[in-house]
From Swiss-Prot:
Gene Ontology molecular function: any one: tRNA binding
Protein encoded by which gene: rpsL
Entry similarity comment: Belongs to the universal ribosomal protein uS12 family.
Modification sites for 3-methylthioaspartic acid: D102
Pfam families: Ribosom_S12_S23
Name of this protein: Small ribosomal subunit protein uS12
Species of provenance: Phytoplasma australiense
UniProt subunit comment: Part of the 30S ribosomal subunit. Contacts proteins S8 and S17. May interact with IF1 in the 30S initiation complex.
Keyword list, A-Z: Methylation, Ribonucleoprotein, Ribosomal protein, RNA-binding, rRNA-binding, tRNA-binding
Length: 139
């Protein structure tokens, strides 16, 4: 434990925490031609590559992901949630933060139902997350 004189010389500093989605925390200022710090809940980007990856040890599947170049110039790996998708190279997508626990290096999710990412077809429950419209009531 520090003495009073030690605390007078150098005060206690609070620990700074790193952001979990760093690509959402800055944008690119075209006029000044440099990065500008401001946080965004989502960012738009263009798919560079759409492919699959196998998850970490206890799980087994082919998880779909896309490499996306964002509007601020950074390049990130984003997960494509839901069953089936129509994304391909040069598709416009909207991404938000949120990691996938069993895919290393994937810190972002693509938002379904916006831009070129179509919603999941025939989805009845949890539709909001997958951009699915409410089904018509049957008579």
């Amino acid at each position: 434990m520090p003495t009073v004189s030690q605390l007078i010389k150098k005060r206690r500093t609070s620990k700074t925490t790193k952001t979990k989605a760093p690509a959402l925390s800055y944008g690119f200022n075209i006029l000044k031609k440099k990065a500008q710090h401001y946080a965004s809940p989502q960012k738009m980007g263009v798919c560079l590559r759409v492919t699959t990856m196998t998850p970490k040890k206890p799980n087994s599947a082919l998880r779909k992901f896309a490499r996306v170049r964002l509007s601020n110039g950074s390049e990130v790996t984003a997960y494509i949630p839901g069953v089936g998708h129509s994304l391909q190279e040069h598709s416009s997508v909207l991404i938000c933060g949120g990691r996938v626990k069993d895919l290393p290096g994937v810190r972002y999710h693509i938002i379904r139902g916006t831009l070129d990412a179509t919603g999941v077809a025939n989805r009845k429950q949890g539709r909001s997350r997958y951009g699915a419209k409410r089904p018509k009531a049957q008579k």
